[in-house]
């Protein structure tokens, strides 16, 4: 059946099969019963026999009346001339009337346009239409060639320089756009008759008279001042700095205050052109602006609020079920051009003062000072000048706490969830204390505002003293949440607070240099987590290193330092999360190589002396050289050059596989090569010829039972003295970002040692051995028998980290072999390994509920038990769902976070299982509870459980209904792909709706398309892989740059190849046909026979 392509009939078949399980088949059948019309029901069918018709009666012929002679109508010449003149007069009158009405209509349109209409400005120079062949595709523009703009094309001309912005904005609820008016003061550096600004998704007026150029005139108004001591606030114009209080003693005098006014220059705008690709708007003037002059540009506009960069509206429902909105700037790269027309490039930075018109009762929180006045039915808030304005408008209230260093932390939330911020305040307080201790530095500001926005999508920008986070990453409910939510809050807050010390990326061109802006907060968040929740950072890194290594072993991986990034399309291709996590792992490897004390000393020196240096990362490596003082030697026995060491890890993709090969009884050789999951997919051309030819400077972290000398680094292959009786281990405690391979015999010896005395190796070393041996077996470098033998000792393992790695590997095996003939054998094998550990953790749930890593292990074991023993798992989960959720919540009218009695760490699985095996009534109950829930974490759990339902039609509606929230729809798609029915729906829905829904809605947002494709597409076989490849060919323009699609194809290629190569080998092992590790005497006898 796998090779049969059912096309659209396949989707209908899925609908019919799964809908029956929910009692919905009747609806489907009723739709197919189309009643006959009354006429069709009464008339007999033509094929039925009929009686012969009666014979016709003879017709009686009637006599025809005599034909009358025709009358001729005559017209005199005079009458004809009169008729002709009347016709001419009618034509002239009709022409005059048409002209008059057209003129009136045109003048009315001009009047409306001048006063209220705003239209998208396009290039008025239109190309002539040419004949084009009909394209047999859904979108004709898919055939257009893909051309990325160059750096020079994207750059703004330097003949005009902004001094300041004064912008008024009036956001409208419901995605109706933001009406705005911008005043921009400009210095003219070179003579020009054009002004070029950045603009994206902004509409301009056609009434060019509304766009004005003025001169700023400063007048002085007199003001009386009494003698005495006066306090004033001074702010240098255009500086963007905070006001500085000054005190002076004066006598009674008259002081003067400068007041600015604007006088029209008489220069007119004759044309306005918009270039969508370059994100520029060009104003053409009727006169040339002179060098050295200063003008103020006034331009009205309307900006969108529905995109994912710039100003965005987030909708939610309050506790009474009323829909409300919050508006917030979306802090990402080059975002000002989405809010108002601006010179949105690093070389043209200028402070902006923002005036916001908003509804009465709402609050404005910003990264600068805010003054609000009441205008009756509305309010006006004015933001002080700042380089990168960042703000939130909404119904907000604050909770606050003061740190020991005197910083006031305020967390702003909706009024109905204010009580759930106590935990976040405490974690923010501890995070600042932890950062101040690690960095030996304090924040420059004495206040920090953290705003919680429902459904917010976290960006990469950092605003001083101002943080915006998703509400679900802030709120904690003691009754409904668990250790996972505590960890989620602590990590997110620690990450964003750490970023306050290091700044953020404000311009695409900086990304190549500023990779550390992602990595440093990631690294420090784990350090802070150890202080806040007592989570061992080394254990956590060992577990989380798995995803980093798996991703980096693919052909679609990316280097940490990405250069030549100029546009938003380039940025969309960058995997920010991966770069941040791998970068943090590299920083940890540096820490383990140089020592904690030296590392902290270097970081502190960087914060105090080099943080503002450019290039940014050069300052950090100088700090390390200073802290090391030439004491640590590198691979060449010279003082370690930290910059060169790190460059080998950040300028090329992937990581090394260090191989240990025994040459004879007294010598081993160490060598390195790039490790890949397989070699079926090629890297992007620009990454194939790596800068260092896939050679790294590798810290070995070596442990040996015999003398091997002072060995710390691997650069080129070299040999070590090692006797046969001695053992050697590399990358102990999982400190390095690489894998290690030993000879097959050595792996078998390791398996025996683990069975005999696994405690002699640290738990992180044991975890790294399990991870490496399975990665090597999956890649074909080792037999799978060798990897499975290493797990023989697992029933005796008591530590958490090795089990975390093993359960993750077992789960991946079950996913790859789902539906395969050996699935039952594999399930029995895994059950024998895990059932004792599962019973052990289940018997003491209190420990798992308070320890994050043990809680993760419990979750992994529950997932595995649901696969290998589904009947036992489902019965228990269903019982919890009925008794702990439906019974107390279904008719109570309460919020789920208040009425649910299901333990917090089990809610995700219990809710999903209950919805999956429930009926339509259960689905609607959970949907209604999710809709009115005010607790962010509980709302997520309820919404995601809806994706477990088994009615395909309901799942499709669920995706469509949640497209306005990228974070929600991606979570739903991931959850669907974890269930058998949802997996059949998600990928097909994306393909079917790419042109009609997704591409249109997210036309200028490739990052969101990338996230949706990554979450929603799962490819399990050749047919599905071929389907996506064909889809990408037909939509090559809109899928260009969606790197998650290439990643999915590579993953599918790897899995398909793996199944072809490994199923027989695994079958033989599970059947007991393999002997296991060979003994020394057996190997010697086999060699003699050869």
UniProtKB/Swiss-Prot annotation:
User: Which Gene Ontology CC terms are recorded?
Assistant: cytoplasm; extracellular space; membrane
Q: Which residues fall in a compositionally biased region of kind Low complexity?
A: 21-33, 241-257
- Annotated keywords: Glycoprotein, Membrane, Signal-anchor, Transmembrane, Transmembrane helix
Residues with an annotated glycan are 115, 123, 143, 176, 230, 402, 710, 723, 789, 894, 919, 964, 993
Gene Ontology MF term list: metalloaminopeptidase activity; peptide binding; zinc ion binding
Could you tell me where the Basic residues compositional bias lies?
59-71
What ranges does the record list as Acidic residues composition bias? 1081-1090
The record places the following residue ranges in the Cytoplasmic compartment, namely 1-77
UniProt-recorded name of the protein: Aminopeptidase-like protein AC3.5
InterPro entries documented for this protein: Aminopeptidase_N-like_N, Aminopeptidase_N-like_N_sf, ERAP1-like_C_dom, Peptidase_M1_aminopeptidases, Peptidase_M1_dom, Peptidase_M4/M1_CTD_sf
The answer to keyword rRNA-binding applying to this record is: no
Ranges where the record places region Disordered: 21-71, 217-259, 1069-1090
